Amino acid sequence: MNENIESVKKYNLWFGNTIDCGFPRPLYTENVASYLGSKVVKVLTGQRRVGKSYILRQTAMHLVQQGISSNNIVFINRELTAFDFIENYKDLDNFIRLYREELKPEGRIYIFIDEVQDIDGWERVVNSLSQDYTEDYEIFITGSNSKMFSGELSSLLSGRYVEFHIFPLSYGEYASIHQLPVGRESYLTYMADGGYPELVHFQSSDVKRNYISGLKDTVLLKDIIRRYTIRDVRLLEDLFAYLVNNSSNLLSVTNITNFIKSKGRKTSYDTVSLYLGYIEEVYLAHRALRYNIKGKEILSGSCKYYMNDLSFKNYLYAGFGYGAG
């Protein structure tokens, strides 16, 4: 067996292997399942650690339960060192070819690629496979950056992909996992804990705080600082903290810039605007624009930011700013 196939087989369902599928999240898996059988590319987007990988695995297990051979399902996860040999689209194309030679799947092949943006030029292979009329592929990908469809791929796959945005656990999911009755007390517990799935396994507040701190640092470092070569890392971190502590308040780039300058920091409107955009792109925060109901138009300038999860506020900046909003 090829050494690359050998190194990744334990992360696949081949040879009777089993994989951890986490907590059932039917809100998403049932939606994805409604598109099974079509060749449109299924795209799961969302911040790191919200559970995209588990939803992929749950979808794969659904296929197996429907009678699809496990040899027809292949997982690729660029966050795992076992897949480090897949650096670019040529490596990805070669791996899929090797997989076909080694496993010899018959019929439709289901390809799951996790954190696809970490493969340089990935869109070339995804586009090629999705349009290959000589072979039968169905492709599922996840990504942690909202700009993954902003360029060439949006044109290449126009009308041939469907996107599912994945959020942290909802209150209903949280209550179900913890087997809590729905009500005010469990809701307040959810608001205090936050919805990142991994937090379910932790009991200590210190452990949860360390996890959330590490998550924040990972997203800022991997998805922003390295990707965009950030020059002022401290400014990026300060802007993130500012958004957390002013979540749901009416803000503008101008007043944020003025606030930073009032603290004796050197920056500019353009830099602040750019960094805020990066924070949005990796789904750490969501921007809500002002809407003029009477004029039926979006008003420029002020807007509100909402964090992807309350855990950043609760565990990292609990002593500052306003409440949950």
Could you tell me what each predicted segment is?
Residues R48-R49:
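Walker A (P-loop) phosphate-binding loop of P-loop NTPases
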Residues N2-K9, N17, S144-S146, S150-L250, ...:
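Interdomain motor-coupling "hinge/lid" segment immediately C-terminal to the ATP-binding subdomain
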Residues L44:
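Hydrophobic anchor at the beta1->P-loop junction of P-loop NTPases
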